[in-house]
């Protein structure tokens, strides 16, 4: 970059230099989304240049929240606009999400070929599908041909999944509370999930070859962090049976990064089960097993949705608080992940409802995370026994996610709710896909009549490329931002004292108009020093 006549102007910034110059760039998507969000001058230039010079690989794009899909669509559209290729990697890609991203890419590619390709050439996009069993490819000139090709591949994959050995079997368990008070709900919730954990441990343990103790590693997944902490305290207070010892690890995304990194390092070692007996040779596990006399040793990870993706962990069993079908599928993939063979007895317990419904039974329950909302998206029931069919909940795999039913019932089915919301967000309705009529001359009377007759246009992810000249302003990035976060955050730092032997917790205070930050010592009443 230093010798380039233009790019040498940004070579002084190490972050920009790394983003542009790296032959292979591995980064989170928030480094690239500014390419389409030019609200502040200059922030879009580096990711634009990166997309111009490389292809785009998106891992687990269906893991994004509904509110983030417009930004993801803008990024894929921009990749097509710049002539890049796009690879989507996930085992649970729903049809509407794929169709919406294809339509966005095709629209961008159309503009690219008009300016950089052969004049008048058809937009025939080479599309390919891969999984561990098969591969397929087809040139798709329009959305209809792409949808048909994708449907064929998804149906073949679903057929193979139906014949595969069943490594995860689920059973539905009731969840009830005698009060709406959060403290009592947390206490009863903890008692019930602990009972399920004991039952699953009894069925799915491994015998320690050195001591003969029965050992299992399980996961209790909860949807939200605040009730998770309350349940963790209730579990700690409740204790365990005299012949059992519970090793509890609380794992969520709001840990300080240093603590979260230490937790993940230990979990990565303990939950690598490719060699079933290797875990008993780990010093940390060995020390914990030898230190306790109880014959049953239960290792439990009480985790938030951060446990579902991103880590290659293998649990013996899991207890799941539901929030969406996608989360159930992703979490089920963490049970016996490294071990083959059929499972005869249930190793997953699905709670019939969740903590949020027990606390607020009149409102949406499967939301934040989840797809439920108010109005058209409010489920008529919040019990999995009515929201999921028997075949959908007994053997959990990707089939409900990769295929959709012709007639969706989003208020009666948790699976249909996800497909319907994705379809509304990603796929343009016929009116939104109509040709541009903005330049058709109209009389004032005709214009007024049309304005009264037309309903306000609904914003979707497709609005970016479907609405004429929408990209000329920053209105859509402002209305549909990527990962909008209104949480007030405080930056803390451990600063050494004058002796260099002790560290003091201080807050980084940045005043407007001041370049250098201030470091303000945190009051002793707000934190506790661990000896």
Identify the meaning behind each predicted range.
Residues 31-34, 63-66, 94, 308-309, ...:
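Residues immediately C-terminal
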Residues 185-213, 217, 223-241, 245, ...:
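The feature captures the C-terminal accessory region of ATP-dependent helicases
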Residues 61-64, 75-104, 333, 352:
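Conserved helicase ATPase motor motifs in RecA-like P-loop NTPase domains
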Residues 88, 98, 102, 107-228:
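Conserved interdomain linker/interface between the two RecA-like ATPase lobes of SF2 helicase motors
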Residues 285-291, 301-315, 333:
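SF2 helicase motor core recognition
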Residues 1-26, 41-43, 47-48, 52-55, ...:
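Conserved C-terminal RecA-like helicase domain
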Residues 317, 324-348:
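Conserved SF2 helicase motif VI
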Residues 30-33, 44-82:
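SF2 helicase catalytic motif II
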């Amino acid at each position: 970059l230093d010798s380039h006549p233009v790019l040498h102007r940004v070579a002084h910034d190490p972050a920009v230099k790394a983003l542009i110059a790296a032959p292979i760039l591995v980064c989170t998507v928030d480094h690239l989304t500014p390419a389409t969000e030019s609200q502040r001058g200059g922030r879009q230039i580096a990711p634009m240049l990166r997309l111009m010079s490389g292809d785009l690989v998106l891992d687990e794009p269906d893991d994004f929240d509904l509110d983030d899909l417009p930004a993801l669509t803008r990024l894929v559209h921009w990749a097509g606009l710049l002539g890049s290729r796009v690879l989507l990697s996930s085992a649970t890609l729903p049809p509407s999400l794929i169709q919406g991203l294809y339509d966005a890419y095709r629209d961008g590619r159309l503009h690219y070929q008009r300016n950089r390709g052969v004049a008048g050439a058809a937009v025939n996009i080479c599309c390919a599908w891969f999984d561990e069993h098969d591969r397929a490819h087809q040139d798709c000139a329009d959305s209809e041909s792409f949808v048909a090709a994708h449907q064929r591949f998804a149906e073949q994959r679903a057929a193979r999944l139906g014949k595969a050995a069943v490594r995860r079997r689920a059973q539905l368990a009731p969840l009830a509370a005698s009060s709406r008070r959060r403290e009592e709900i947390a206490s009863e919730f903890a008692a019930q999930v602990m009972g399920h954990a004991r039952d699953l441990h009894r069925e799915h343990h491994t015998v320690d070859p050195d001591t003969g103790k029965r050992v299992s590693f399980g996961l209790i997944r909860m949807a939200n962090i605040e009730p998770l902490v309350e349940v963790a305290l209730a579990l700690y207070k409740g204790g365990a049976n005299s012949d059992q010892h519970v090793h509890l690890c609380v794992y969520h995304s709001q840990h300080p990064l240093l603590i979260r990194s230490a937790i993940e390092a230990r979990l990565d070692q303990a939950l690598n089960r490719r060699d079933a007996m290797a875990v008993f040779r780990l010093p940390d596990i060995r020390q914990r097993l030898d230190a306790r006399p109880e014959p049953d040793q239960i290792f439990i990870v009480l985790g938030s949705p951060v446990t579902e993706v991103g880590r290659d962990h293998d649990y013996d069993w899991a207890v799941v608080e539901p929030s969406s079908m996608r989360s159930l599928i992703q979490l089920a993939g963490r049970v016996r992940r490294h071990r083959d063979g059929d499972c005869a007895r249930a190793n997953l317990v699905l709670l019939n409802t969740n903590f949020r419904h027990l606390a607020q039974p009149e409102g949406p329950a499967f939301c934040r995370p989840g797809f439920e909302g108010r109005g058209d998206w409010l489920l008529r029931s919040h019990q999995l026994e009515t929201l999921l069919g028997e075949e959908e909940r007994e053997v959990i795999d990707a089939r409900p996610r990769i295929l959709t039913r012709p007639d969706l019932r989003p208020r009666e089915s948790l699976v249909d709710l996800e497909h319907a919301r994705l379809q509304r967000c990603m796929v343009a309705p016929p009116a939104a896909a109509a040709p541009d009529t903005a330049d058709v001359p109209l009389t004032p009377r005709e214009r007024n009549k049309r304005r009264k007759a037309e309903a306000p246009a609904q914003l979707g992810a497709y609005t970016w490329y479907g609405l004429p000249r929408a990209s000329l302003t920053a209105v859509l990035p402002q209305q549909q931002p990527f990962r909008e976060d209104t949480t007030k955050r405080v930056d803390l730092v451990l600063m050494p004292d004058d002796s260099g032997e002790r560290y003091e917790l201080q807050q980084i205070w940045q005043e407007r108009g001041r370049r250098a930050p201030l470091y303000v010592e945190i009051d002793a009443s707000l934190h506790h020093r661990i000896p």
